[in-house]
Regions:
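Terminal, low-structured helical/coil segments at or just beyond the last alpha-helical repeat
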Residues: 1, 140-167
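Alpha-helical adaptor scaffolds
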Residues: 43-111
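Alpha-helical segment of the N-proximal tetratricopeptide repeat
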Residues: 4-54
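"A position-specific structural signal for the A-helix of alpha-solenoid helical repeats
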Residues: 9, 13, 47, 81, ...
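Structural marker of alpha-solenoid helical repeat scaffolds
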Residues: 3, 37, 71, 104-106, ...
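Register position in tetratricopeptide repeats
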Residues: 20-21, 54, 88, 122, ...
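TPR/TPR-like (Sel1-like) alpha-helical repeat modules
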Residues: 121-144
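Boundary/linker segments of alpha-helical solenoid repeat arrays
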Residues: 42-43, 76-77, 110-113, 138-150
Length: 167
């Protein structure tokens, strides 16, 4: 993939900055100024996905992530983002099916087994979820513990673990 032209890169960085500041309207305005033929660039798709996620436009998130997977399958973000958006759309089985095959390709990414654990928990597959969470903990225990503390997707798994401890 060719690098972005300086003007497009400027708008992309500005959009990213506006997103970090919580100003989605300005971020959208910057993205709108990027050349039309560069909207499928992986870096643009990543920032577009972030904007759509802030807006909770999960259908647009799925589309952006699918394009990202097509344009840059070597990047874990597209795979992770697509499944996250599918899960937000209550298409959790599909989220799991799409993310599970790349877990070995991106074995250094704790968020993949973590998200798989969330999806499996929501699907009622608690034992498999526990294995995935254990895998995530081996990769980055601090990040996983921070993410898991208040994650409602893992509540059924936590209850199961508590029951095992007490009983």
């Amino acid at each position: 993939m060719n690098p972005l032209r300086p003007a497009d890169l400027h708008h992309l960085r500005a959009a990213e900055g506006w997103l970090e500041l919580g100003n989605e309207a300005e971020a959208r305005g910057e993205l709108d100024q990027i050349s039309t033929n560069r909207l499928d660039h992986p870096d643009v798709l990543e920032i577009s996905w972030m904007l759509f996620a802030k807006e909770q436009n999960w259908n647009a998130c799925v589309k952006a992530a699918e394009l990202l997977v097509q344009q840059a399958p070597e990047r874990p973000g597209g795979w992770i983002h697509r499944s996250f958006a599918l899960h937000e759309l209550k298409r959790t089985e599909e989220a799991f099916i799409n993310l599970n095959p790349v877990r070995r390709i991106f074995s250094d990414q704790w968020v993949i087994p973590y998200n798989l654990a969330c999806y499996l928990t929501q699907l009622g597959r608690i034992k498999e979820a526990a294995r995935e969470l254990h895998t995530a903990l081996k990769i980055d225990p601090r990040a996983v513990k921070r993410a898991a503390v208040n994650d409602p997707d893992l509540e059924p798994l936590c209850k199961h673990i508590d029951e095992l401890r007490s009983g």
